[in-house]
Amino acid sequence: MTTQTPPITNPSEKLPTEPINKALNRQMLVILDFGSQYSELIARRIRETQVYSEVLSYRTTIEQIRQLNPRGIILSGGPNSVYDNRAPQCDPEIFHLGVPILGVCYGMQLMVQQLGGQVERAKRGEYGKASLFIDDPTDLLTNVEDGSTMWMSHGDSCTQLPEGFDILAHTENTSCAAIAHHQKKLFGVQFHPEVVHSVGGIALIRNFVYHICQCEPTWTTEAFVEESIREIRAKVGDKRVLLALSGGVDSSTLAFLLHRAIGDNLTCMFIDQGFMRKGEPERLVEIFDKQFHIPVEYVNARTRFLEQLAGVTDPETKRRLIGHEFIQVFEEESERLGPFDYLAQGTLYPDVIESADTNVDPQTGERVAVKIKSHHNVGGLPKNLRFKLVEPLRKLFKDEVRKLGRAIGLPEEIVRRHPFPGPGLAIRIIGEVTAERLNILRDADFIVRDEISKQGMYHDFWQAFAVLLPVRSVGVMGDRRTYAHPIVLRLITSEDGMTADWAKVPYDLLETISNRIVNEVKGVNRVVYDITSKPPGTIEWE
């Protein structure tokens, strides 16, 4: 998505009435998901070419695909073997739709098998980097250099191709690393062009999108803003909309977009549960209410939330109680401020994919979801609230939301704000949450952010924060023995939060942060640095 947007300041401004789906999806590519960890990444790579894409279940019927009228289809990878009885299979009729198809890894093997070829267990699997030797540099492999590094992850190989298919490329261990049926525009690659490790992978994807599928780059921020405002106005009309504002980039971008569309018919409610970072509640109200004249209903519920967590040490219980209390407060305040017809939610496309149940159990072929930790998105939806939903961001990935926010005038400090969990500091305090421990952590966390900002390094990190442990350590301050809390520093780098590395922070910066914390934060006498990546750890401690 590009980031140029015309000014839209009048909620009654007339815009074209073409529906958003028809306008934005007229050059759509579909990814059929067979359980690959990279399916979302494929969609993002396509969208980076400014062409719209969606991830659908492999169970999607041929009629449903026809109705979408895609310019092309991509079959994702997956953990199964196509010759297993329970391996996920798509409708083989898709190969007769007359649209270009690209099979990736498992997707290529499935194409080969369903069209009469043969797939067998490889004598030697390929995992990691491999050199791609090109036999036919046309079509799919145009501008992909011979010998390029590609990322492999397969234990099966195609041993016999269907009639009409040619080999485009091979590796040292795989004779069919890329294949094509040029007449039918069916292509397959045994590697993963979507991952950053595949040099030339982006060129391959662009070849498929632009030259083979004949798409044009129309998926832009400008188009999305216009279409979204048009859709919001058509759906909401003159009805009232309630939005639970958290201060994060998702809800803030949504607030700006809705305010452009419906003006004062939007009510933003900010529930201060007492677990935000130092100065954030005040700054949030200042930005929205004072600077951009978007009224915010501020609800101070700090005491209520703290009382709910008294004596609680289990992290999942914390999350559940915070979510439950949020719903209680939200219900009470919406009743007081209402009535409302619509509830706005900052649902993003990964949430839509996840709720569509697109994971495959490699043993059974059944769709499953694995719980790592419960997530808290402003407490979740109250089930008994009789609101209609409006979710303008449900088509977007996180990076697209940031581009959108920047395009519609959201301040950079919000657009590039580090991700912050819904339960806030409550899950960065290991053990019981008390007012005293909140103050300790809030002050220490402020110093971390203050120092990296002074060094111009804030945006070098995906996240940078402090954690308070439920233990004490012995120290010496002013020739006296101390027995106080240790603070853990957690600074990490990441592209999308799915994986993360601990940041190699300059020692002098760590020293400055440590010195400030032990000298300025009462109750702390030790600072340690977390050097655990994700995996095996998670970004948050709870």
From Swiss-Prot:
Question: Hey, which pathway is this one from?
Answer: Purine metabolism; GMP biosynthesis; GMP from XMP (L-Gln route): step 1/1
Cross-referenced PANTHER family: GMP SYNTHASE [GLUTAMINE-HYDROLYZING], GMP SYNTHASE-RELATED
The answer, when asked if Transferase is one of the entry's keywords, is: no
- Coiled-coil regions listed: none
* Protein name from the UniProt record: GMP synthase [glutamine-hydrolyzing]
Tell me what organism the protein belongs to: Rippkaea orientalis (strain PCC 8801 / RF-1) (Cyanothece sp. (strain PCC 8801))
What does the subunit comment say? Homodimer.
- Stated role: Catalyzes the synthesis of GMP from XMP.
What gene does this protein come from? guaA
UniProt-listed InterPro entries: Class_I_gatase-like, GATASE, GMP_synth_C, GMP_synth_GATase, GMP_synthase, GMPS_ATP_PPase_dom, Rossmann-like_a/b/a_fold
- Signal peptide positions (record): none
Query: What is the superkingdom listed in this entry's lineage?
Result: Bacteria
Which segments constitute the Glutamine amidotransferase type-1 domain? 28-218
Give Gene Ontology CC terms.
Answer: cytosol
What are the leading ranks of the lineage? Answer: Bacteria, Bacillati, Cyanobacteriota, Cyanophyceae, Oscillatoriophycideae
Q: Where is the active site?
A: 105 (nucleophile), 192, 194
Question: Which residues are involved in binding ATP?
Answer: 246-252
Q: Which segments constitute the GMPS ATP-PPase domain?
A: 219-417
Catalyzed chemical reaction(s): XMP + L-glutamine + ATP + H2O = GMP + L-glutamate + AMP + diphosphate + 2 H(+)
Q: What keywords tag this UniProt record?
A: ATP-binding, Glutamine amidotransferase, GMP biosynthesis, Ligase, Nucleotide-binding, Purine biosynthesis
Question: Could you give a GO molecular-function term held by this entry?
Answer: ATP binding
A UniProt-annotated Pfam family: GATase
Q: Known EC number(s)? A: 6.3.5.2
> What Gene3D superfamilies would the database entry show?
3.30.300.10, 3.40.50.880, HUPs
- Whether Membrane counts among this entry's keywords is no
